[in-house]
Amino acid sequence: MTTLTLVLTAVGSVLLLLFLVMKARMHAFLALMVVSMGAGLFSGMPLDKIAATMEKGMGGTLGFLAVVVALGAMFGKILHETGAVDQIAVKMLKSFGHSRAHYAIGLAGLVCALPLFFEVAIVLLISVAFSMARHTGTNLVKLVIPLFAGVAAAAAFLVPGPAPMLLASQMNADFGWMILIGLCAAIPGMIIAGPLWGNFISRYVELHIPDDISEPHLGEGKMPSFGFSLSLILLPLVLVGLKTIAARFVPEGSTAYEWFEFIGHPFTAILVACLVAIYGLAMRQGMPKDKVMEICGHALQPAGIILLVIGAGGVFKQVLVDSGVGPALGEALTGMGLPIAITCFVLAAAVRIIQGSATVACLTAVGLVMPVIEQLNYSGAQMAALSICIAGGSIVVSHVNDAGFWLFGKFTGATEAETLKTWTMMETILGTVGAIVGMIAFQLLS
């Protein structure tokens, strides 16, 4: 099948999905499944491969996310009901002031997300944003956009995030320069796409705290201290961070290395934190065991719907990936004769927009530009700058084929149209600012 046909099929699928969800008001899960199957048929995918691809997309997306979102939902709900999240929110508001709350939550997202996957950081911190919104009476948009921007900036640009680590290794970039240029991209990107954009778009889009988030239930005990509350939030971050540090100093394959790998896996880290929150906080406050289990059960109800829609988004992404549209589009764009830094950004952005996966966009862009770059003998510093250009392109224009789009919408209660105005624009601004920093760095280093 020709490149043009594949691209038209992908674009048509996205437009049809937007129509079904936003105009026809079809449930997002059903619409995603219908369009995924249609995209497989029209892209020329063998009939016996379509169902297998859909299963692969669902399993690949939920294999990690299901456990993270479920445990994270219970953990966050326990912290909320015991007043721990309120303590953190109140302390942050006292330290930064109500007028700078959006900068505080953005910075928290940027720092806390360093050792974590994007989704893990969001499920751990979203309850803090809800609590801050309740205390300040602020439009939720003004707080969740900076939070998501901070987490997204760390995930896209900062080592040891999975994406920048992958890019640095694939591009043979200098890790020191990768850290420096990544910081120069992440910090202004977070500020512009987070607090500044969130403040602006909050005039036009209003989101409210979800209905299931009410005043904390404190049982018969006292409000936990700020120090203990913060330590609970930081516990999974520390466990994951220990794994990252151990990978540098402990011999791979040793017993100690395997233990650090086990303890620092997000599943283990969040499970441990969840158990500490239940037995070390809720029950010590005097909360009955039945009440604690009821809270955990209630936390899983909205999580189930969130996971189904995200999984369906993964199905759509996988169908587009397996159709071959990414490499076909990339090869067409490579021959356009653009400057190499711009080419890196445009390639990653094009694949991202068509397929939805930031990781696939990064890998596709690297695979297409490396044969050209290797002949030019760029330094490790220049390769780091080009890596940041690719990272920026890989996160722009997040829409209905990206799991992050549905994660934002379902956690915040935003409609699809509101998610496009808030989340999609935030990601686009963040990626563009980061890529511009990468392009400037490449020019200065040339």
Curated annotation (Swiss-Prot):
So which stretches are on the Cytoplasmic side? 1, 48-58, 131-142, 198-225, 283-294, 352, 409-424
Q: Which InterPro entries match?
A: Glcn_transporter
Give one Pfam family, short name only.
GntP_permease
* Localisation: Cell inner membrane
What membrane topology does this protein have? Multi-pass membrane protein
| Role, per record | Part of the gluconate utilization system Gnt-I; low-affinity intake of gluconate.
Alphabetized PANTHER family for the sequence: GNT FAMILY GLUCONATE TRANSPORTER, LOW-AFFINITY GLUCONATE TRANSPORTER
Q: Name it.
A: Low-affinity gluconate transporter
